[in-house]
Amino acid sequence: MNLFNADHNSEVSCYRIPSIITASNGDLIVAIDERVPSCGDLKWSDDINIVMRKSSDNGNTWTPIRTIVDYPKGESASDPSMIFDEVTNTIFLFFNFMNHINEKDKYYLKYISSSDYGKSWSDPVDITNQISKKNWSNDFKFITSGRGFQAKDGTLLHCLVNLQNGTHVFGSKDNGKTWFISKTPVTPGNESKIIELSDGSWMVNSRVNNSGYRYSHISTDFGNTWNSKKEIDLIDPGSNGSLIRYNQNSQNFLLLSNINDQKERRELVIRYSLDEGKSWSDPRIIYREEAAYSSMTVLSNGDIGLFFEADNYRNNFFTRIKLDEIIEF
């Protein structure tokens, strides 16, 4: 199902940067950039809004497109990502902000939240100072789009890219009241996803430009130190993927979606890992043509929901995949 296509709106250049989560009531929420004057990223576009749609029937039908972050022209919000806090039933939707008129090239890191499954949203909250380090003020930094993760103890975890100072984990131990940033960056790494492993350690899976592969990074001390390796079975051209845990119907394993090509953004696949990311299955091809960023979630009926960019950023599809199409037990 094609959820966002700029061909149907003459005022929009393209929709990019998909994010999807499942709320505790089973609702699916998708968010994406609405890029108005051009398809350029935040640094190069002065009018990007964030819009959403919602499904209450596992993706069969969707609400109309609705704008949830919209600053005046000259100010842009981009790169949505979400975490659903199971403790407080709160959706956190993170985004990156730039004022092209007064502070061009300066990145701010913000979120809005919803306590009613996306019906209403808070005003933006600026957490730049909480999740930045000294001397980062003018760095090229941004919260990774897609989604974050909630650990077993309730800690909210997510990834932040700083092109000058490395990719860091950030999060909250008090359900979003305050935020922290990890001591040490993962290297190498661009847009990254974090998951908690069964032993409580953190695993970050990273896009690494110009390498042809993804990298994984594991920390057993909450981001103070990292053990990193090139994942030779996970080829990648340098594109944002999605890493989630499937924990439903007595099944518990990891899922990864990414582009299965070392040079071009084409052939979107899903792999699974039954050993906490030590090894990965052969890829299951979801889309053979041009594709790019993807975001995954587990639906209330046990299916996998995948929201992804396709066809040179013209289309943004949602597809539902049954578990037995990917994995055999």
Where are these regions (language model features)?
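Asp-box/BNR beta-propeller blade signature and adjacent active/binding-site loops
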Residues: 1-329
